[in-house]
């Protein structure tokens, strides 16, 4: 009996076990987990990112050491070579003749890496930050300090990549080729193995890396080309002296007679196309022969375009795919959800589904339209601001006073001017990012309000809230419109008369009566104008937030605008330190033929007979030598004219020596 009971118990338990196991027969077992639909699995690279970045960091440090040895060997004085290594400069921002392509590409690569830090859980690739458990049982990790450290790591990582171009040597070009190929190869390898990423959007990492890949690809082609050219033309020793091609071209363009092509045809005889071209030429930036924008302005413009792309991409992929998923998942249950809030769109549930989907599609279209409008306005204002930069720099170069509020008191460098010059590109990039974000919010609210208050009600014939409000308040709007129209008509036909060709005020009594009677109505008009003033000023400041060449504050408070203050100081440094006219004049002085060195003269106390006879012969042949000294005389006059120009041009005051202020006649100093 006991055995039977035990058998029955075992059968019962096994049966129960079989019954329980049948409950989970459709569940995935063990490691055979199925990913939900639409979820991108985490991709594992063949080589760990920590190992790749450790190799890149080591290679960059080695290249930097080799460049330091090269700079110490080539550029430092031999007697000072044992004191330390010469740190190569990544970019010479004040040089006018250097190519802007390599610095712009390096800055694009650096900024793109910083943009990729936003969704990354590991700011430093060679550190694997694991989440720590909090006392509440939740997983938390403080990544803020590591992201701040990454802001210093990436500039140090790409420092040698930019310094190889500024060294201008065959060995530097070879090191730049190896380093650029290594960076480009690692990025291509990572994106080829893992093109999709579950963070934010599956293709966001790949799309955000396009500027990075373009910049590294350009550098991986530029360095080999420069290496081949240096080997072919034997220019490995580098160029010596001042680079004067741009400064001499600027001087020739400045001194040559200008062609007045625009004045040859009257404005009345121009066609519509020519007028449009002239308007665009005066409104946006077009290249001008003989003038080149400073390197920092070119870099800031490039970074503004890159920042616009990165911010627009982030705004697009973080909202539009989510709205599309929500629209695709709408079913008849949404009618019950809306009914819970007291919203009944229709009695037919299927019609409610179609209406909700159409409204979501309208929101998506308004969002994309606002994003396109924001990007277009940013690019147009960027092109227009480049023309303003050029006009301001040309005015400072010729010594004119700029129409700035407050005006520049002096172009001498100062502490604030140097700090502003250092941070100009970074400020411009940050202002562009924030300006695009604010523009997107304002334009999206405007387009959405216009769509749901005007277009959607007119298409569906329901929810005509705007038309109903106008229907109920039409007496107010009619009164305001009539008051404004009648005041303008009375001002033109009753209170003004033309006397001897000049307008004069008349009917003063009627003018005072109308002013008193219309005071309450004008208060209503003033309230409307106040709202319009707030809207138009907000829109204007939003659109021009990314521009630093104009102040968003009134003239009396323009100095409180940090962006405008930075721009003024930036112009001060550029005008005082990279004046192309000064560089050209100094190059002409350095390249001028120097007189032949003469042997040192003996003391003048006693002359030997031979020297006395030689002096007599020189006195006799003075007239003959004066005939052949015409060329030297003209050269001396040209040098005196150059010195006079350098001394009296107000835009060149920063280049004068302080000793010239106390100079005496014939150059003798006290």
Swiss-Prot record:
- Annotated transmembrane regions: 51-71, 98-118, 145-165, 169-189, 206-226, 297-317, 369-389, 424-444, 475-495
According to the UniProt record, one GO cellular component term is:
plasma membrane
Describe tissue expression: Widely expressed in the embryo. Detected in adult in the retinal pigment epithelium in the eye. In the adult, is highly expressed in cells that compose blood-organ barriers in the brain (choroid plexus and the brain microvascular), in testis (the basal layer of the seminiferous epithelium), in the yolk sac, and in the chorioallantoic placenta. Detected in white adipose tissue and skeletal muscle, but not in liver (at protein level). Widely expressed in adult, with high expression levels in the eye.
Q: What happens when the gene is disrupted?
A: No visible phenotype at birth. Measurement of the eye diameter indicates a tendency towards slightly smaller eye diameter 6 weeks after birth, and this difference persists in 5 and 10 month old animals. The retina inner and outer segments are shorter in mutant mice. The number of cone cells in the retina is reduced, giving rise to a reduced cone response to light stimulation. The retinal pigment epithelium displays discolored regions, where cells have large vacuoles and a reduced melanin content.
Q: Which Pfam families does the UniProt record give?
A: RBP_receptor (PF14752)
Q: Where is this region: Interaction with RBP1?
A: 235-294
Which superkingdom is the protein from? Eukaryota
Protein name, per record: Receptor for retinol uptake STRA6
Q: Which organism is it from?
A: Mus musculus
Q: Could you read off the lineage of the organism from its UniProt record?
A: Eukaryota, Metazoa, Chordata, Craniata, Vertebrata
């Amino acid at each position: 009996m006991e055995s039977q009971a035990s058998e029955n118990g075992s059968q019962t338990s096994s049966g129960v076990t079989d019954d329980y196991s049948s409950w989970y027969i459709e569940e995935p077992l063990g490691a055979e987990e199925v990913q939900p639909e639409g979820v991108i699995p985490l991709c594992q690279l063949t080589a760990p990112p920590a190992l790749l970045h450790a190799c890149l960091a080591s290679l960059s440090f080695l290249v930097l050491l080799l460049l330091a040895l090269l700079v110490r060997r080539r550029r430092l004085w031999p007697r000072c070579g044992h004191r330390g290594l010469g740190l190569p400069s990544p970019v010479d921002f004040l040089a006018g003749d250097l190519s802007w392509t390599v610095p712009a590409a390096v800055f694009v690569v650096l900024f793109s890496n910083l943009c990729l830090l936003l969704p990354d859980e590991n700011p430093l690739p060679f550190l694997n930050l694991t989440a720590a458990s909090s006392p509440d049982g939740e997983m938390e990790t403080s990544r803020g300090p590591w992201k701040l450290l990454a802001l210093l790591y990436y500039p140090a990582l790409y420092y040698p990549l930019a310094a190889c171009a500024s060294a201008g040597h065959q060995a530097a070009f070879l090191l730049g080729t190896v380093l650029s190929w290594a960076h480009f190869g690692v990025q291509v390898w990572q994106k080829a193995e893992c093109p999709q990423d579950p963070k934010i959007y599956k293709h966001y990492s790949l799309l955000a890396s396009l500027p990075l890949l373009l910049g590294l690809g350009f550098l991986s082609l530029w360095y080999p080309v420069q290496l081949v050219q240096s080997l072919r033309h034997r220019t490995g020793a580098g160029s010596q002296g001042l680079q004067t091609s741009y400064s001499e071209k600027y001087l020739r363009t400045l001194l040559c007679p200008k062609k007045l092509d625009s004045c040859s045809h009257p404005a009345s005889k121009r066609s519509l196309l020519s007028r449009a071209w002239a308007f665009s030429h005066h409104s946006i930036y077009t290249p001008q022969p003989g003038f080149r924008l400073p390197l920092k302005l070119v870099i800031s413009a490039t970074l503004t375009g890159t920042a616009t792309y990165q911010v627009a991409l982030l705004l697009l992929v973080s909202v539009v795919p989510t709205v599309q998923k929500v629209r695709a998942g709408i079913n008849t249950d949404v009618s019950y959800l809306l009914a819970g809030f007291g919203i009944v769109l229709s009695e037919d549930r299927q019609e409610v589904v179609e209406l909700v989907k159409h409204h979501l599609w309208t929101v998506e279209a308004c969002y994309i339209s606002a994003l396109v409008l924001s990007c277009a306005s940013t690019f147009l204002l960027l092109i227009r601001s480049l023309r303003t930069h050029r006009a301001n720099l040309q005015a400072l170069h010729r010594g004119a006073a700029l129409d700035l509020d407050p005006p520049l008191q002096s172009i001498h460098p100062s502490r604030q001017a140097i700090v502003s010059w250092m941070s100009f590109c970074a400020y411009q990039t940050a202002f562009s990012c924030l300006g695009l974000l604010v523009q997107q919010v304002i334009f999206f609210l405007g387009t959405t309000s216009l769509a749901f208050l005007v277009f959607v009600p007119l298409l569906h014939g329901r929810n005509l809230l705007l038309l109903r409000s106008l229907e109920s308040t039409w007496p107010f709007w009619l009164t305001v419109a009539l008051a404004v129209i009648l005041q303008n008509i009375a001002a033109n036909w009753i209170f003004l008369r033309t006397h001897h060709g000049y307008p004069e005020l008349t009917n003063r009594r009627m003018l005072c009566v109308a002013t008193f009677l219309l005071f309450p109505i004008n208060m209503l008009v003033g309230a409307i104008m106040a709202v319009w003033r707030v809207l138009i000023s907000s829109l204007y400041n939003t659109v021009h937030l990314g521009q630093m060449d104009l102040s968003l504050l009134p003239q009396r408070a323009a100095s409180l605008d940090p962006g405008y203050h930075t721009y003024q100081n930036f112009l001060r440094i550029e005008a005082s330190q990279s004046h192309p006219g000064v560089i050209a004049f100094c190059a002409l002085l350095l390249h001028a033929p120097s007189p032949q060195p003469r042997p040192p003269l003996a003391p003048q106390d006693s002359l030997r007979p031979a020297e006395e006879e030689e002096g007599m012969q020189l006195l006799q042949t003075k007239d003959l030598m004066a005939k052949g000294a015409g060329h030297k005389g003209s050269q001396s006059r040209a040098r005196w004219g150059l010195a006079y120009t350098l001394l009296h041009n107000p835009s060149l005051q920063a280049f004068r020596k302080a000793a010239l202020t106390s100079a005496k006649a014939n150059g003798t100093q006290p």
